[in-house]
From Swiss-Prot:
One of its GO terms (cellular component) is actin cytoskeleton. This is Cofilin-2. GO terms for biological process: actin filament depolymerization; actin filament fragmentation; actin filament organization; muscle cell cellular homeostasis; positive regulation of actin filament depolymerization; sarcomere organization; skeletal muscle tissue development. It comes from Mus musculus (Mouse). InterPro entries: ADF-H, ADF-H/Gelsolin-like_dom_sf, ADF/Cofilin. Interacts with CSRP3; possibly two molecules of CFL2 can interact with one molecule if CSRP3. Disulfide bonds: none annotated. Belongs to the actin-binding proteins ADF family.
């Protein structure tokens, strides 16, 4: 069921910037987004980038010790969100980086919010071409342990996420 919600151009720009890893200067790399949240506009007609709800690559090791834990803390406890998380992980064979699309729909969110976010999910997913991993999360217990994301990324072959062993 489509909700008629549209995706703001800035959301698509953020996605494309996160997806394309062109060779960049050190300054450009620091400005790359590691994680970003998207929400519905106040009038519930557009999916927009949520202001100040992001982690930049340059923040890691500076103001952000562990990007995964910091990302989980950005999620609102009582409302839904969409998120992109640029996961850096290691398998038994190699290091990898993949974008993960996350639909955050906690049990404590209002029913109306869960319904409009669920019915608008396809609109944003269609704009995020090439995403390999999608994850619907219904509460902190599902997301606070990084090993759950490790399983989504590659099951038992994933040995670490963001430099931390699983």
């Amino acid at each position: 069921m489509a909700s008629g919600v549209t995706v703001n151009d800035e959301v698509i720009k953020v996605f494309n910037d996160m997806k394309v890893r062109k060779s960049s200067t050190q300054e450009e790399i620091k400005k790359r987004k590691k994680a970003v949240l998207f929400c519905l506009s106040d009038d519930k007609r557009q999916i927009i980038v949520e202001e100040a709800k992001q982690i930049l690559v340059g923040d890691i090791g500076d103001t952000v010790e562990d990007p995964y834990t910091s990302f989980v803390k950005l999620l609102p406890l009582n409302d839904c969100r969409y998120a992109l998380y640029d996961a850096t992980y290691e398998t038994k064979e190699s290091k990898k980086e993949d974008l993960v699309f996350i639909f955050w729909a906690p049990e404590s969110a209002p029913l109306k919010s869960k319904m409009i976010y669920a019915s608008s999910k396809d609109a944003i997913k269609k704009k995020f071409t090439g995403i390999k991993h999608e994850w619907q999360v219904n509460g902190l217990d599902d997301i606070k342990d990084r090993s759950t994301l490790g399983e989504k990324l590659g099951g038992s072959v994933v040995v670490s996420l963001e430099g931390k062993p699983l």
